[in-house]
Amino acid sequence: MSAYRKGNIFIISAASGTGKTTLVSRLLANHNGLRVSVSHTTRPPREGEANGVHYHFVSKEEFESLIAQEAFLEYADVFGNYYGTSAEGVNALAAAGYDVILEIDVQGAAQVRDALPEAVGIFILPPSFDVLAARLNGRGTDSREVIQRRLSKARHEIEQSVLFDFVVVNDDLARAEEDLRHIVNACRLKRSRQLGFIADLLENS
């Protein structure tokens, strides 16, 4: 966290099964000053997921009430479940100087970029479609039909990677995490992000 600047907002997107969630968890554990925006969703929790930590799990009625209140930076219906990013939560973290990670799909990323053009987009790519299919099958949580739908959607999502600022290939977790850390550090060191520090330095010279 920096006392001199508003935090960066990083949008991290990927096709399902690319390892995005694992990468974000590793980045948060090993990199100071980062916070993840906890999304709202209407889907049931998976084993090991905690409310308020992995997601804010809400009913469809609660989610639609928040939509009516314009509480989301973005939201989407994904395979029959709502997902959304709280505008208030993101803005509060960034105002406090934290860099905020939004772990969202490409549809949500486009909505956030429209609302926050300064946000930095990072897309995680699989090394191949064969590896992606193996990862989805290895989860053991989805039917064959759902997996085929996810693979079909993955192709479309990967085509949208051209709209992002950076791409990271996740063929090795440690190397992909290092790539993400380099991106975060480079964005923190932009002159436009250091104006508060420069002004304070000159004022006290």
From Swiss-Prot:
> What keywords sit in the KW lines?
ATP-binding, Cytoplasm, Kinase, Nucleotide-binding, Transferase
What SUPFAM superfamilies does the record point to? P-loop containing nucleoside triphosphate hydrolases
The keyword S-adenosyl-L-methionine belongs to this UniProt entry's keyword annotation: no
GO cellular component terms, alphabetically, are:
cytosol
Task: Write out the annotated subcellular location.
Answer: Cytoplasm
Residue stretches making up the Guanylate kinase-like domain: 7-185
Under Enzyme Commission nomenclature, its number is 2.7.4.8
Q: Which GO terms describe its molecular function?
A: ATP binding; guanylate kinase activity
Checking CDD domains in the record gives: GMPK
Q: Kindly state which reaction or reactions the protein catalyses.
A: GMP + ATP = GDP + ADP
Q: Does the keyword Ribonucleoprotein apply?
A: no
**Where does this chain mainly localize?**
cytoplasm
Q: Which residues bind ATP?
A: A14, A15, S16, G17, T18, G19, K20, T21
PANTHER family from the entry?
GUANYLATE KINASE, GUANYLATE KINASE-RELATED
Question: Can you tell me which family this protein belongs to?
Answer: Belongs to the guanylate kinase family.
Protein name (record): Guanylate kinase
Q: Please give the organism.
A: Neisseria meningitidis serogroup A / serotype 4A (strain DSM 15465 / Z2491)
